[in-house]
UniProtKB/Swiss-Prot annotation:
Its main location: plastid. SUPFAM superfamilies: Ribosomal protein S7 (SSF47973). Gene3D superfamilies: Ribosomal protein S7 domain. This is Small ribosomal subunit protein uS7cz/uS7cy. It comes from Manihot esculenta.
Length: 155
């Protein structure tokens, strides 16, 4: 048994312009090779594009998109007696948000388009409306969990 104390849970910091934790989580996920200023640039340009497209507050569009993509349940591979089962597990809010952000960024990277800011803004607007690749990913995850409900007792 470890003698070390339990690690303190870190509180998410908020970004300098919007003073929002979700924006900061998005910046930290989009970050590549430690170029945080570039990540901030991409996010803020995407927010401006959302403002121009929808003529509403880009933060509310971001919140709506993340809320729409956040999964309630996921599947986890569990080895039981020589065979691997996909066991459905419930997801907490923080982990769900992290998954949603990862899916949104993955879907926007796959999109055809000029630059990342344009692709991200399009994906966020689509997700807020209830369409797009990230929403499809969430629905697919929920379908997988529903199909493997029989293995829920393996938790």
């Amino acid at each position: 048994m470890s003698r070390r104390g339990t690690a303190e849970e870190k509180t998410a910091k908020s970004d300098p312009i919007y003073r929002n934790r979700l924006v900061n989580m998005l910046v930290n996920r989009i970050l590549k090779h430690g170029k945080k200023s570039l990540a901030y640039q991409i996010i803020y340009r995407a927010m401006k594009k959302i403002q121009q497209k929808t003529e509403t507050n880009p933060l509310s569009v971001l919140r709506q998109a993340i809320r729409g993509v956040t999964p309630d349940i996921a599947v986890k591979a569990r080895r039981v007696g020589g065979s691997t089962h996909q066991v459905p597990i419930e997801i907490g809010s923080t982990q769900g948000k992290a998954l949603a952000i990862r899916w949104l960024l993955g879907a926007s990277r796959k999109r055809p388009g000029r630059n990342m800011a344009f692709k991200l803004s399009s994906e966020l607007v689509d997700a807020a409306k209830g369409s797009g690749d990230a929403i499809r990913k969430k629905e697919e995850t929920h379908r997988m969990a529903e199909a493997n409900r029989a293995f829920a007792h393996f938790r």
